Amino acid sequence: MRIGLIDVDGHNYPNLALMKLSAWHKKQGDIVKWYEPLFDGFPAPPLDRVYMSKVFTFTPDYEFPVNGKEVIKGGTGYFYPEGGEPLPEEIEHIFPDYGLYGIKNTAYGFLTRGCPRGCGFCIVGHKEGRKSRKVANLKEFWNGEKEIVLMDPNILACRKHTELLGQLIESRAYVNFNQGIDARLLTPENVTLLNAIKIKKYILRGTIRETKKRLFQS
């Protein structure tokens, strides 16, 4: 099969779903490429399948006609707030194709999904559920990369967070908690675990200045 991919939001930030779709189709022996309207559009022969992924609702939709026998749209940008159909399990848990975006030393992924908070500005509770749960081990999307971008909405709320933080510690990679850390769950035990991680970037959610100081106490 000839597979086309469209990152509707642009290529400024790697789309994890597209990287997984690329990895799975390449494993099947399919030809995977970025859809290019100049070369793949009409009157060129249609691609067998084109995936269009849109994360943000404010992103304008793709402006060009899509020349594909089958066109599949996905992402919260198209299906707000439910998020649309999830990826099949065999695709969801495949190692991402980081080469799609030319990524060499950074891993992207989720160890947990869901969040109990239900904040009015956030769709995670509606989309992923009001309970944080483990969905993967680190090895599922990390293979020695120097940096890990962790996209978990609330890893500390997961019952297995101690195990998962231990995996991050053992990796010795720099970790970017890009969705933040819930300051309300900063127990002394959790602070000790976080102090053992090589944290590159973090945001404290639901906090005050005094709570922020606790994160890196010796």
Q: What is the predicted role of each segment?
A:
Residues M1-K73, F79-Y80:
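A short, structured N-terminal alpha-helical element that caps or precedes a catalytic domain
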Residues P116, G120:
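Cys/His/Pro-rich metal-binding microdomains
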Residues L5-I6, G10, Y51-V55, V124-S218:
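Core AdoMet radical
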Residues M1-R2, G29, P45-L47, G68, ...:
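A general structural motif
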Residues L18-S22, D61-N67, G83-L87, E163-L168, ...:
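Short, aromatic/basic amphipathic alpha-helical patches
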Residues M1, K73-T112, C122-E147:
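N-terminal [4Fe-4S]-dependent radical SAM core
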Residues L5, W34-E36, V71-G75, Y108-F110, ...:
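A structural signal for short, well-ordered beta-strand segments and their strand-loop junctions
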